[in-house]
Amino acid sequence: MNNDQPLLKAQSPAGLAEEYIVRSIWNNHFPPGSDLPAERELAEKIGVTRTTLREVLQRLARDGWLNIQHGKPTKVNNIWETSGLNILEVLVRLDSTKLPSFISNILSARTNISAIYIQKAFKVEPQKSLEAFKDLDTLADTAEAYTNFDYDLFRKLAFASDNPVYGLILNSLKGLYTRVGLFYFANPSARELAKRFYLSLKTLCQTQQVNDVKECIRQYGKDSGVIWANMQAYLPANFNE
């Protein structure tokens, strides 16, 4: 196996094969639209059996990385056109140089999406929405507590909006959400800003000022974005592992 790039930390032959192929695609060693080498050649190059390789190829095809064509070479897809949120964790680990901007884009998307579904939740399920804030008064001043509360709050409000798709989106982001949250909420200023935001959001729900929800969320997105931008330089070296 002579891919110049270091591999992710594989724990099994299947993991090794998957990581080799994924990294080769990401580094344009196997560019979008190209054909993968024949199974026998690729299996020998990676050092796994053809059976193991075949299982890996099928899994990567399900995730959108590849297009398996029976009787034809396996073709590499453009993941930005064929994959879903399930590959985000992999992308974060693949390229540490793009990690800060990648996370910023995810946080921006979260702000824009949540501004829609939280307003809807407050309209259609005000009582259920209020229940999502029930642990706010006893929220411990720790990064872990804030990370868990923040994720649970946004997730509960997503399902309260009567559109479960928003909840499924958050489910797919949980691993990354937790990793970013534990780092971000280690900053006392981030926790203080978040607490004020939660209280403001709760008040808007109680008073049914639903037309002010989007602006409240977008302002929090801007303010928290400033804190995040200042923290990016201190991301630990192993953050994307």
Curated annotation (Swiss-Prot):
The keyword Ribonucleoprotein does not apply. GO terms for molecular function: DNA binding; DNA-binding transcription factor activity; fatty-acyl-CoA binding. Pfam families: FadR_C (PF07840), GntR (PF00392). Its main location: cytoplasm. GO terms for cellular component: cytoplasm. Residues 11-79 form the HTH gntR-type domain. It comes from the Bacteria. It is found in: Cytoplasm. Residues 39-58 bind DNA. The keyword RNA-binding does not apply. InterPro entries: FA-response_TF_FadR, FadR_C, TF_FadR/GntR_C, Tscrpt_reg_HTH_GntR, WH-like_DNA-bd_sf, WH_DNA-bd_sf. Keywords: Activator, Cytoplasm, DNA-binding, Fatty acid metabolism, Lipid metabolism, Repressor, Transcription, Transcription regulation. GO terms for biological process: fatty acid metabolic process; regulation of fatty acid metabolic process. Multifunctional regulator of fatty acid metabolism. Homodimer. This is Fatty acid metabolism regulator protein. It comes from Pasteurella multocida (strain Pm70). The gene is fadR.
